[in-house]
């Protein structure tokens, strides 16, 4: 019995030990199942993403293929609106880059009116170039037309003149301009040694009178109410649409380059010869005929201030006909000959110019150039041609009304030589003694702009329109305060550029 009981107890213990092992096995199975489920879920998601990407690529490729097939089979008649792009071009009219040029044809009524007036005098005209951004021409008239010239110069500009004269057509312009003006490069961009058209283009001959063109503005030609600079339109005109609607070809340029192209030119002479300046950058060949001193236009001195003087073209021609060799192109200064010449001719000039003292302050005969040497034959020639000066140049109006930057009272002929030369100028007349002003320090010849550079690759300087307007108003106020022109001394010599105001 005891053995049987012992076996029963052993069986119970074995059963108790087997039950916890079964529970542990069940737990391990559950954990294994959970891990397997997670792994399967991750694998399933990864496979689904890959499958989805593959499906998307396949759909995109199929769509592209269908679009290409549709385009090749039936091309669209009109472009897609989504592919159309609007192109906007904005053009800005810069007042600095605009140029004033002569119209090739009379396209307006005012130009037509001027063409009719210029046809009857075309046989008497000669044209000449003026260096600078303001290239202007004016027809010349023969001597003996004093009253007619006065009427032309003093005529008010309310009759509808065009801004510039029409250039004559035909062989004259073909000789003076071998290539069209607008086909050339900008003259300001040329170097100073090659910017003067005198050395490049042939002339019709210096025997004829070359005068500046009449500017058609409401301020007068000779600066009685402002001159060339005041005749420029206001800066607002360049920005207005009226400028674009002009019937004739217009390139307005609001700059004035008034620069001398030689070391012997002074700024005062440049400013005093805005209307008529025959620029010369280098001495011309000796065979070329130079301007006649007895035909020099108003405000222009054919004698450079460096002590050399070109010979008279008419005198050259006369000597050539007599069988003499033409004289050299330049004559060195000789103070002793000048002294004798001035003493010899003082009486003749006092008699010839007594009635024109109010109109001849800056274009007196060559006697005022004290550093110029003359022979006895040349002195007789100049004295014989003194009446030519009286007939050619009309009486100019006094500066009591207004002046401009074109210093009309500039005594370019009466500039005294430097004090170092030691030359005593005899007082041939009261007019010379009053007008002459000594300038011991030569003015600078470099061109200094008033305001700014236009920028870009341009090498030229420009004047600001506001600065020009201010200086014109200042000159008008200055001229209104001048005394009445009782004598020639009432017209002062406006050496404004020498003081650095205009430079």
Swiss-Prot record:
Disulfide bonds: none
Biased composition (Polar residues): 348-367
Start-end of Basic residues biased regions: 493-503
Origin: domain of life: Eukaryota
Taxonomic source organism: Mus musculus (Mouse)
Protein name: Uncharacterized protein SPEM2
Gene: Spem2
GO cellular component, one term: membrane
Keywords, ordered alphabetically: Membrane, Transmembrane, Transmembrane helix
Entries under Pfam families matching the protein: Spem1
First-listed, main subcellular location of the protein, grouped into a coarse class: membrane
Subcellular location(s) per record: Membrane
Keyword Membrane: yes
Transmembrane helix found in the keyword field: yes
